[in-house]
Amino acid sequence: MSSSGYGQSTAGAIFLLISPGARAGGMGEAQIAVANDATASYWNPAGLAFLSGNELSGMHVKWLPGLADDMTYDFLAYNQSLNDFGSIGGHIIYLDAGKQTRTDSEGNIEGTFSTYFTSAALSYSALLTRTSSIGLNAKILYQHLADRATGTEQGNPWSTDFGFDFGYLKRDAFNGLLDFATVLINVGPKISFIDENQADPMPTTLKFGFNLHAVQQQHNKLNIVYDVSKLVVASYAAMDWDGDGWVGGYDESGRGGFVNGVPTETKGYEYNQDGQIETTHSDPIYLAIFTSWVDDWLLGGDRDMENYDRRIGGWDENGNNTFQENQIVDGDTITVTIRNFGDVGYGAYNLDGKLEVGNKNDRSIMNEINTLVHNVGIEYWYNDMFAIRGGYYYDFTGAIASPTFGFGLRFSNFGFDFGYTSAKKDTDPLANTMRYSLSYKF
């Protein structure tokens, strides 16, 4: 989300996208081409290969203080150099979402329960050349929504899952002027709780980063950093892919399943006659890496908006039904001309007045461009002891535009960092969030 965005996502385990480290927090969360401390285990495991010695880094922060007063986020990272055999590391994340109130079906309070999320990752990184490296994370995550299901729900409101991160880093390109990197994080199977049929994809994210060494003097260093990222999750709303005016109605082999002329809700009849799934779904990761760049504008057809009746259109802009012969108006039954999908006069709207027929034409490539999240940061070091930082986090779809500020201190083997997110409280839940990090090299 980095930490703030991706609110538009239909992915699960979004807590994995919360950005750790006060240093990153002060630089607009731009970090994957920097990755030169223990937090590289999170940002880009490829960065660990360039580190010498060992380092331990941690952060504790009160999370989303504008929304809740009992949420906390903790992060701990470690790296260890194996000299000619590369580097190892890892990190632990714990997000405590606080106490929730349990009620019965009639709204009576039954007590409280805890909600929390945690993950642990192991990292390995090795040099490809003197100036390039690759890295890998293997992680396990546990999400605990509640201690038991509610009402008639079957199953458990918690899940245990796994995932992987892959990173590449190139140092000192263009005569030492530029570092650049790419990572693909949170690659893994879908996540489910109560109902496996409603499983959400992992928050798989592709990032590209650049670190420009604008000033490299003995006592003065200035770096300008830029990251751009995209959630590579291809999720589709209920849509009419084949243009027959219906969402689904057939099984995977093309056998029809209509009841009174309307697609059945029975499981297995989510397809059109060509075998394409038309109900809400998402692509598997091996497809989503590619289709996530076009799913919001090029792929799919007219959407079944909001009421999800499986019918595309059928009502005119005044709310008049155009497909039933006998209708009741002011208590009287009247006969009207029946119009089928595609006929002149067939209503383009649904019962709620939302345009459905032809709404696929309203999507454009800008829908995809607007899903990109941009992070810009600047960091000035004096004598490798004191740093001043600034940055900007921009997420168009999530309606987030947040300036960030921070500073860092290094003394002997100890480090302290502070990061501050400045934003309007009504637009960014991270407004006025202050992050503090400590590190120790040994």
Regions found by a protein language model. Give the residues of each.
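Subset of outer-membrane beta-barrel
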Residues: 4-442
